[in-house]
From Swiss-Prot:
InterPro entries: AAA+_ATPase, AAA_lid_4, DNA_helicase_Holl-junc_RuvB, P-loop_NTPase, RuvB-like_N, RuvB_C, WH-like_DNA-bd_sf, WH_DNA-bd_sf. GO terms for cellular component: cytoplasm; Holliday junction resolvase complex. The lineage of its organism: Bacteria, Pseudomonadati, Thermodesulfobacteriota, Desulfobacteria, Desulfobacterales. SUPFAM superfamilies: P-loop containing nucleoside triphosphate hydrolases, Winged helix' DNA-binding domain. Its main location: cytoplasm. One of its GO terms (molecular function) is ATP binding. GO terms for biological process: DNA recombination; DNA repair. Residues 2-201 are annotated as: Large ATPase domain (RuvB-L). ATP binds at L40, R41, G82, K85, T86, T87, E148, D149, F150, R191, Y201, R238. This is Holliday junction branch migration complex subunit RuvB. Belongs to the RuvB family. Residues 202-272 are annotated as: Small ATPAse domain (RuvB-S). It is found in: Cytoplasm. Has 3 domains, the large (RuvB-L) and small ATPase (RuvB-S) domains and the C-terminal head (RuvB-H) domain. The head domain binds DNA, while the ATPase domains jointly bind ATP, ADP or are empty depending on the state of the subunit in the translocation cycle. During a single DNA translocation step the structure of each domain remains the same, but their relative positions change.
Amino acid sequence: MSDGILSFSSKNDKRGETSGKELITPSSQPVDDSSEVVSLRPDRFESYVGQTDTVETLKIAIQAAKMRGDCLDHVLLHGPPGLGKTTISHIIANEMGGTLTVTSGPALEKGGDLIGMLTNLARGDILFIDEIHRLPKTVEEFLYPAMEDFAVDFVFDKGLHARSHRYRLKQFVLVGATTRVGLISSPLRDRFGIFRSLDFYTDEELVTIIRRSAGLLNVVLDDGAALELARRSRGTPRIANRLLKRVRDFSMVRSSGEVTQKSVAAALSLEGIDSKGLTVLDRNYLRTIIEFYRGGPVGIEAVAATLQEETDTLVDVVEPYLLKIGMVMRTSAGRRASVGAYEHLGIKHQMELF
């Protein structure tokens, strides 16, 4: 396998994979695929919390495919980072009984990288491409016949001597994940039979996830601690699990080991996370709009330049949650800070000065 590719298996076969979700090729391992994080992932839809409509849609589609003895339609998942797109791909593989191969758009630099993976897939296997919007155009074009006809076309020689050969693939399921669905070309997007957008989780859903993760990590926490942690997790399970570990460490060193609401507040204060889950970068983003650009409107490139941050970081990581809770507004003229942003930062709104 080429760099950037991981293989997992949910069945026994003769290709070297083992049962369960054991890591086979660790090269270029994604940051959220450490052994502890993987252990916190639910492996069936029955234990998956949140995204009710998406889960129901996939359960129906999977059951129908099994009844027909057919493969599942290709799936495209859209949403901010950390909402469960990779986890859902693992669950789809488990539910369908296929082997999961994980890669990402930037890792597939040449058409040969993709073709090598496609030709190694068995019937019913799942290929998960994270950040699919970052696929090079030349690689993306190989996906069109692969998704539609389960075939890839090879061209030999050039000019008058050019010859084309079609290689038949086994039927597979492509699961694509993206944070920027608008950057996916229409020909690729239209080839997905199932398209679902994932939304931020409610505090109640996050409390359930935190309690499950705490049990797996042998962490004792009370109701107030679970709710406080949920409120500061930006509606994102990945962040909730990460903060739970930081709070666990803090409680082990600075208190009796039991996680309380007070220890959550103290631990996350050290992390620079406030009562609404805003990080230092979030607050600097809002302060930049308010103090440097008088509340906006201002273009995202100008904000990124002032903060010395990548524009994609602000668009993909910072803005989704701030938009969700109404701290910032996107207008045709640019970004504008809301009254709520002024109040949260303790800054007097400009309109009140006159």
